[in-house]
Amino acid sequence: MGLGASSEQPAGGEGFHLHGVQENSPAQQAGLEPYFDFIITIGHSRLNKENDTLKALLKANVEKPVKLEVFNMKTMRVREVEVVPSNMWGGQGLLGASVRFCSFRRASEHVWHVLDVEPSSPAALAGLRPYTDYIVGSDQILQESEDFFTLIESHEGKPLKLMVYNSESDSCREVTVTPNAAWGGEGSLGCGIGYGYLHRIPTQPSSQYKKPPSASSPGTPAKTPQPNAFPLGAPPPWPIPQDSSGPELGSRQSDYMEALPQVPGGFMEEQLPGPGSPGHGTADYGGCLHSMEIPLQPPPPVQRVMDPGFLDVSGMSLLDSNNTSVCPSLSSSSLLTPTAVSALGPEDIGSSSSSHERGGEATWSGSEFEISFPDSPGSQAQVDHLPRLTLPDGLTSAASPEEGLSAELLEAQTEEPAHTASLDCMAQTEGPAGQVQAAPDPEPGLCEGPW
């Protein structure tokens, strides 16, 4: 006895349907499954007609193994089973199973799905399970949807045996229920019944028709984690982003980008408790504190829009201070600064539009003048090697200490000792009309030559 090879669905759609299998019977020992199995062949005889062929062949093979071909509705396949008919097993019949000749093509449609089960109802007292139990048969033949409801009405107040299949345990059991319309609720069974295509038994055990899980009890509310929320004054569970020009992009999923949460640095500095605060050192956040040890970098420098009325070259060294061969008496404080530029004269100030380096010299070029300074002027201070300043005739703007230039630097410059004769610092003018080479006023501390 046992299972043999399986094959596809056979031709024809009739066979002997097993409605019930008794315990310890030859049918149970052979592995026959109630409701889902159809005996279509015994020996070499095809059982496609309602006659006594099955009974006769079973009697002819008492206490002898006989092969059966069985079609299963769950797997939709045919398998071979070996059974030993016997009348000594302790029950009724040679197989210990009740059979009925019918078509297995529409047998899966005759199913009544148990839905909601009310507490203390006849269905609940009988042990029917909501959404996983399927009523597949009874003592009477059920072929239409109305047959089941007619059966319930005819057994009002009387016990009724039902064959029930459970999709969770994948097994059939016999349930005895007593319909009672006066149980205190709706209906005679107190349960919902579904019939039709959407309420058929699935080919494999599934939770498709299971009742959705109930909501959490009031005493135990569900906790939903919020990634962007953390206690006030406590460090966040993620490190602070540094020098990020935009949101960091996380994993890409299909057609959208997931942006990881970010916390501004200023916000975290306000939220972190200080050494003297009450909450400092009291909370233990484990590994979260290690992520807060990342040093914060200063913000990028502020880029200011310069006023077109003057040239801001503060903080730039236009001459090599280490080379003293050009101007021995020129100190580091007398380099070209906004104050030094203002000392050149009322017409020596212009607006600049760009600055760049070319050919080993630093050049500031604008729409109105150009200043060039060589990196290495040479071993001797000569006039031809000094930077030249060319201004147009129409330049009339002048800068004053009140417009942004430092008056203190101007006074410090005038206090330096004179190392060059005043006649050598006089202005020299040359070139075509419309171009003027301006020389600074005779002041001590300035080198001789055009600027």
UniProtKB/Swiss-Prot annotation:
Keywords: Golgi apparatus, Lipoprotein, Membrane, Metal-binding, Myristate, Phosphoprotein, Protein transport, Repeat, Transport, Zinc
Effect of D393A: Blocks the caspase-mediated cleavage
Outcome when changing D375A: Blocks the caspase-mediated cleavage
Gene: Gorasp1
Membrane spanning stretches: none
Protein name from the UniProt record: Golgi reassembly-stacking protein 1
UniProt GO BP: establishment of protein localization to plasma membrane; Golgi organization; Golgi ribbon formation; negative regulation of dendrite morphogenesis; protein N-linked glycosylation; protein transport
Modification sites for Phosphothreonine: T220, T224
Gene Ontology molecular function: any one: metal ion binding
